[in-house]
Amino acid sequence: KVRKVQEKLGMSRTNKAIVGPATTAKIKEFQKSMGLSQTGQVDYTTWNALGLSDDDWHNLGSYVSPIQITKNSTKNDCIETMISRAYDYLGTEYIVGASGQPGQGVDCSGLVMQALYSVGINPLPVSVIRHSQPGYEYESRNLFTSSKFKTVSYEDRQRGDLIFYSDQNGTIIHIAIYLGNDQVIEAWPGKVVVWPIKNSHRDRIAGVRRVFN
């Protein structure tokens, strides 16, 4: 939703779809021009005034991948389903704070959330709606501390594990899904890609979490 609003307001396209000061100022400016209450927030009235659709208002920013397993699915079935769902996003644009459908835009934690949803795992309080709110852009940090996943050693990593990366200060900055053979699938600035588990962009691995024990 934020990306669509920014485009309608004529703002430059970046990889961040976040309501920051610049976006808020633009919204207030538009609301003033339309005789609307200048809140800086896009409610339904402002959304319609921008010429955006009802369908997008009700559906964008709340997409959850449908569950693709059954009660008879094995652990391996679940791992492969989760990875297959992540592959559906290959080439999808990287947008900070996004967790949309394939082709709409995701960031690293948005991609992982959709993969988890496909196997019936809801990582609350982490959610697609919260993820789009200011202050929750980097949900990888909250997934890292979640009690829903088992901590395993880097040496014990297996296909389907979640790989977390940190900056030089130890702050979690990124998450990817391990594919095996030292490859991961991840959303990285640009688009969703398959890359080596370590490369020049991010090589500080903070930890590994197992989704299926």
Q: Residue ranges of each PLM-predicted region?
A:
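Acidic, Ser/Thr/Pro/Gly-enriched interdomain connector segments
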Residues: K1-A17, W57, G61-D77
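Short acidic, glycine/serine/threonine-rich helix-capping segments at coil-helix boundaries
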Residues: K1-L52, P125-I129, Y178
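Soluble non-cytosolic domains of exported or imported proteins
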Residues: R3, A17-A22, Q41-Y44, S73-E80, ...
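Sec-exported extracytoplasmic/periplasmic mature domains
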Residues: E7-T14, K28-L36, G51-D55, Y87-I95, ...
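Secreted/periplasmic proteins that engage bacterial cell-wall peptidoglycan
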Residues: P21-K28, T81-L143
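Terminal recognition/anchoring or ligand-binding modules at protein termini
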Residues: Q41, D54-N59, G190
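...with weaker cross-activation on analogous glycine-rich loops/strands in unrelated enzymes
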Residues: E80-I83, I121-V194, F212
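Non-catalytic cell-wall polysaccharide-engagement segments
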Residues: S200-D203, G207-N213
